Each structure stands twice: as C-alpha cells, then as structure tokens.
C-alpha cells in the first residue's frame, strides 16, 4: 500500500469514527429529553416506569385538591374517567388550574404510585390538549359508558 493510500485510509477511518461518536452523543442527548405520555389508567396498570420523568395528563378530579397551609405544596388527583392518579407539586400553580380542568403534569412516579411533579401545565381549551390526553379521556369515557370528559370547561 502506498503512503498516499494509507493516509487516505487513516483519514477515512478517523472521519467514520468521528461521525459515529457524534451520532452516539446525539442519541444519548435525545434519550434524556424524551418524556413519554401516560394516562392515569396506564399509570394505575403499572405501564409507566418508576423514577423516570414522564408526562401524565387528565382532568383534575373534583374535591381532590389539597393545599399545605405553610408552603406551596399541593396534592390533587387527575383522572381519565376510569382511574385516578395522585399528583404532588411544590410550586405556584398556573392561573388556569382548577378542579375539572385538563392538565398535563411532568415529573417522576414514586414507588407508591404518586406522581412527584416538577411542572404543571393547565389547559384552558381542548384544542390545546395533547392528542394523547384527548384520546385517553375519550377512551376512558367509552370504557365507563359516560360522555367524554375532554369537553372544554367554561
């Protein structure tokens, strides 16, 4: 093999290795930023991973909101019409947050099945609800024989 071919082969191998490392780093970064959506029924069935950041969406269950008197900690239940999941959040809730309203909570599921949320997003209209949440609410209503709970709240 001539020195020129040897140099080209080394350059090509270095380039292929660099591209491989770049792709591996990009995939690792994307893996850490993916937040999969789970409905309360999926969480109750054990389909959601523990101690991994997830998104959970549904309607805030009427009568479930509990506020700590000496802090910003709140606890409430979200439902898809079939199952309920408790959510604990330390922080200021969005202005549009209220019972019966659609929300998406981002956080980690603990061993007791409670979502320890670090972010709560309130939805004021079904048009802004993630498709997964709307589908879960419609599916829950069909299972329970009721009307879909994804109707907008006035």
Swiss-Prot record:
Any single Gene Ontology cellular-component annotation: plasma membrane
Classification via InterPro entries: CcmE, CcmE-like_sf, NA-bd_OB-fold
UniProtKB keywords: Cell inner membrane, Cell membrane, Cytochrome c-type biogenesis, Heme, Iron, Membrane, Metal-binding, Signal-anchor, Transmembrane, Transmembrane helix
Topological domain spans for side Cytoplasmic: 1-8
Membrane-topology descriptor: Single-pass type II membrane protein
Domain of life of the organism encoding this protein: Bacteria
Residue ranges of the region described as Disordered: 130-154
This protein's record includes keyword Zinc-finger: no
Primary location group: membrane
Residues annotated as binding heme: 124, 128
GO biological-process terms attached to the record: cytochrome complex assembly
Location in the cell: Cell inner membrane
Residue intervals passing through the bilayer: 9-29
Disulphide-bonded residues: none
Pfam families for this protein: CcmE
Stretches of the chain found on the membrane's Periplasmic side: 30-154
GO molecular function ontology, one term from the record: heme binding
Role noted for this protein: Heme chaperone required for the biogenesis of c-type cytochromes. Transiently binds heme delivered by CcmC and transfers the heme to apo-cytochromes in a process facilitated by CcmF and CcmH.
Membership in a protein family: Belongs to the CcmE/CycJ family.
Protein name per the record: Cytochrome c-type biogenesis protein CcmE
Organism: Bordetella petrii (strain ATCC BAA-461 / DSM 12804 / CCUG 43448)
């Amino acid at each position: 093999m001539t020195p020129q071919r040897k140099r080209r082969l080394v350059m090509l191998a270095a380039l292929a290795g660099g591209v491989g490392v770049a792709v591996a780093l990009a995939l690792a970064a994307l893996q850490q930023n993916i937040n999969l959506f789970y409905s309360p029924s999926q969480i109750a069935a054990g389909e959601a991973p523990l101690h991994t950041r997830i998104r959970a969406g549904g309607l805030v269950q009427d009568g479930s909101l509990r506020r700590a008197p000496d802090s910003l900690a709140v606890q409430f239940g979200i439902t898809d019409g079939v199952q309920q999941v408790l959510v604990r959040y330390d922080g200021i809730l969005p202005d549009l947050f209220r019972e019966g309203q659609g929300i998406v909570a981002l956080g980690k599921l603990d061993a007791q099945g409670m979502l320890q949320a670090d972010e709560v997003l309130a939805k004021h209209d079904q048009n802004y609800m993630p498709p997964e949440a709307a589908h879960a609410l419609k599916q829950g209503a069909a299972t329970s024989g009721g009307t879909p709970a994804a109707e907008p709240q006035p």
